[in-house]
């Protein structure tokens, strides 16, 4: 027997799951469509028919909260609770789950249970939160499919606060779990954790120059460095960083101060040991660790000897009670810089009495020095934060209410409108950051509205473009935007360059009287106008088709609209209308994928929509780029037929491309990068070829209508209840 190959891997082609180069590594500049496929049903073990909202109806919320209350004080030997209470740990887990949200693109946040997966499960700032998740496993195991991890993380934080004396503002279930890491979230370009901040600031002296859409000063942090940016203590500089990072999470100064104080009223920081003694984070842990990271195999490493952030100590005298102790500690003492046992910078009081110190987490006969982070000291040295905190200190009830509301906002900001909330503790009060929309009318004559629109004299391009502009703001990351509410008629949307204000004003002046005369909301009329335009274009192509429509959208008022927060939804690029506000570092086709992913569309849906929008003449400003047809206004597959025709050649001409006849050299059309990518990228070309086929004319129309309807209804959560 020949044993020369003994010990070699029997799979001769090697491993495609570890070190082998992927397609994108071989060709790094190739357009990667993975973000459009990341939440396919294939990796989801629940199956296509699973309905979490239906499962929630079976959940015994009172029993669940009772179990969570019991968990808080059920200390486990493998990870003992500080002072016998897991509240601080659970709050940090919930906070860091929700706190990754950023306003710019709505990504991050606690709405998906993403903390279970890389990179978040192994971020330096999330150290030892794997222990919190494992402590929750018996409860998740007990309640099964009736309770998502995403809901459990946030509820555990809520119950932790309640168990320590805070009256919370409320809680909503409804967060659905994802089943693999998110590929669409840009966390930064750095290649190492906690890399120097110069890599994400255009100007280190200007906190506002933090790279968009990022919301943290370093790679691997939720907000700011507790020791000061780049580990250099400077409370005033930290104040600026805190202000910018919390603003990027849609928090104002008062909410920021309340969250900082309320978050550090309970629990402690851990740094009584050496970070070098810790093992790898969960994603890199040895297989026998079973997903446990930061394990200390060299010393005791738990209880009072835990190392997490490197800072060591509690902020208050009673770290398991929600009281006013944070303000008393911060403003009642002078502070000096010291190094923790782990070598981290922290602030300690100069003149504190022993009886005002918190007790040791294991031995109540021992007193320990309290601490403040650089961000805590910012609350004292920044004049705006100080004034707010002193106001809180004088009015405890106001502080508790402000914090409870800010905590609710923090933990629910990415859930979208209130109609998505489920459960017995949903607050009755409507909050402006929920983008409230009044109920719409469903009893009007839809046919009569469509007839009036058709008789208005508005063109297919005007009808379709306006409806598209109204709906395209939807983003599935935080469920904001969309056609419902007709906020396209309000500031700031009515003035966005991408919405062509003059054209928009003209179209709305024609549609508003129709809404008034028929009893329909303007939001419904705008969508119906787009549907009429699509139906007219389909008819011009030889197909009679009715675009599905569901009435019931409402019209939001200016008072119900936080104009500043809606600025983040402005489309700076929209490939569907061949619009680019200005040149960006990223190529237009990458921006197209980003918007497509936010809208919840697939690669084929993106393809059919772009092709249809081009032939209907919906380009921003009426440009001719990509209008590969002689029948503009008809919903034909001409875009794809001519894109894939080898009788044409494509020649760069300044900022665009000429489509020329190969034989004569005559320019037939012009195009942009987002037009040509559908013939250049191998995957998109495969989709384009499907729609270019001779037998695809009807399929193209039907697929366009289906994708169009998906966009128009993306924010109709009332239809999905």
Swiss-Prot record:
Position of the Tryptophyl-tyrosyl-methioninium (Trp-Tyr) (with M-249) cross-link: 95-223
Modification after translation, per record: Formation of the three residue Trp-Tyr-Met cross-link is important for the catalase, but not the peroxidase activity of the enzyme.
Cofactors named for this entry: heme b
NCBIfam families for the chain: cat_per_HPI, PRK15061.1
Entry annotation: catalytic residues: 96
Positions that bind heme b: 264
Listed Pfam families: peroxidase (PF00141)
Reactions catalysed according to its record: H2O2 + AH2 = A + 2 H2O; 2 H2O2 = O2 + 2 H2O
GO BP field: cellular response to hydrogen peroxide; hydrogen peroxide catabolic process
InterPro entries: Catalase_peroxidase, Haem_peroxidase, Haem_peroxidase_sf, Peroxidases_AS
Protein name: Catalase-peroxidase
GO molecular function per UniProt: catalase activity; heme binding; metal ion binding
Cross-linked residues, Tryptophyl-tyrosyl-methioninium (Tyr-Met) (with W-95): 223-249
EC number: 1.11.1.21
Keyword line: Heme, Hydrogen peroxide, Iron, Metal-binding, Oxidoreductase, Peroxidase
Organism, scientific name: Parvibaculum lavamentivorans (strain DS-1 / DSM 13023 / NCIMB 13966)
Positions marked as site (Transition state stabilizer): 92
Gene assigned in the entry: katG
Role noted for this protein: Bifunctional enzyme with both catalase and broad-spectrum peroxidase activity.
